[in-house]
Regions:
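Conserved active-site neighborhood of enzyme catalytic/cofactor-binding cores
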Residues: 1-8
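Active-site substrate-recognition segment that forms the wall
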Residues: 10-15
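C-terminal, non-catalytic "cap/extension" segments appended to globular domains
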Residues: 16, 20-149
Length: 149
């Protein structure tokens, strides 16, 4: 996998993980405050977004108290939908690395068909059979470490 692709996947993962954390914390807040009004939920979500930003993004990007992670309005009408996105980025990178090992286009096509035929499995079971490893952030973190050194 080339460095640009790795960085693109990593950045997408980093970005959506923040929104996913806001989603999870917002739902925890809502369950703890079942009689909250829409305005109270809005204010809580903005506060949560700022907290997540300050903990995970401000040290890297420098801006303090950014509410931008609260921008996904569908986190309210599609509960716990956003936390699934990071898994997609993690799996994407593991598959990219796996396919990069194919010697030629035929090997790639054969491997793609093998993986497609695995059927409906849980994500981790699918990955074990597809690439021989659990779903893990280790491959992308190791690749990022290699790139930035």
């Amino acid at each position: 996998v080339d460095d640009s692709t790795t960085l693109d996947i990593f950045w997408g993962l980093y970005e959506i993980m923040g929104v996913s954390l806001v989603d999870m914390y917002m739902w925890q807040w809502l369950y703890a405050n079942p009689t909250a009004t829409a305005d109270q939920l809005r204010q809580a979500t903005i506060s949560i977004a700022k907290d997540v930003w300050n903990k995970y993004y401000q040290p890297v990007l420098g801006e303090k108290d950014s509410p931008i992670l609260a921008c996904y309005s569908h986190m309210v009408n599609s509960p716990m939908y956003l936390p699934n996105y990071p898994f997609g980025h993690i799996i994407e990178f593991q598959l990219e690395e796996h396919f990069a090992k194919c010697a030629n286009q035929k090997a790639f096509a054969d491997e793609m068909m093998r993986i497609y035929r695995l059927g409906r499995l849980t994500p981790n079971q699918w990955m074990q059979q597809a690439v021989g490893a659990n779903v893990s952030t280790d491959p992308i973190l190791n690749a990022i470490d290699r790139i930035v050194k």
